[in-house]
């Protein structure tokens, strides 16, 4: 799934927080799902300072622009102190996970949602009775999951992607982690990324001060709105391939989902002057929360990292 780190205002001390930038409400109602699961997997030992939260946010604004303080301070806690021993453990170990299940009545979405959780820790592995979540006050609102942890410390997967990950582990087919997606102006910027029509990648923070300048790498004029990249986590959704350190992957247009697939990248290079058959073969975005019709393909280019900078597998 698409996990982003929100920007904080100047002078504010950033705290660990990230946003799962896939609208849970849209994922369920548009796809007519009655049940949707999210796995939050911890890649390091982490001490959670507070519960996960659910936040309604207006559709008219890009969630990538949501201030980190708002993401941290607002929203509905998914569990409280009153849950006592039934609440997920706040002390997490590497490879632990918390599974979140969401339910809705597709014939009457006005009834809202219900949700429950399951903690993989043996003493806590009890799924709660589903809790009701009221629908948004306006139809334009979207529902996001807020996590009180640094983006680099977790992997957030749909149930399908989690199953693919377990299959890869079973066959020991994990491969080398792909490169970190770095902004050409500020490599260490943690905010979400965008791609210009030329394929070069920048962060949202630098984009805000762009002022109609040409791309700083190729000097081509910026003639259209940049594509918001969705750097999804998990295995390759097409063939569970293992990308190498030179893999750039392919961005699907218009959804902006980045597919870290070496085989797709190779097919793109072979057919880049006649991509229509490849686009028709893909047809729809393969990621479960998206599934938007693919109209174009674009190979992205980002600032190369130093060897010590690596992230875990980004792709679903």
From Swiss-Prot:
Effect caused by changing residue 203 to S: Impaired interaction with rde-10
GO molecular function, one term: zinc ion binding
A GO biological-process term: regulatory ncRNA-mediated gene silencing
The keyword Cell division is annotated on this UniProt entry: no
One Gene Ontology term, aspect cellular component: RNAi effector complex
Summary of the knockout phenotype: Insensitive to RNAi-mediated gene silencing.
Keywords of the record: Metal-binding, Repressor, RNA-mediated gene silencing, Translation regulation, Zinc, Zinc-finger
Matches recorded under InterPro entries: Znf_RING, Znf_RING/FYVE/PHD, Znf_RING_CS
Keyword Metal-binding: yes
Zn finger (RING-type) start-end: 183-218
Assembly with partners or alone: Interacts (via RING-type zinc finger domain) with rde-10.
Function: In complex with rde-10, required in the endogenous and exogenous siRNA pathway for biogenesis and accumulation of secondary small interfering RNA (siRNA) intermediates, such as 22G-siRNAs derived from ergo-1 targets.
Name the UniProt record assigns to this protein: RNA interference defective protein 11
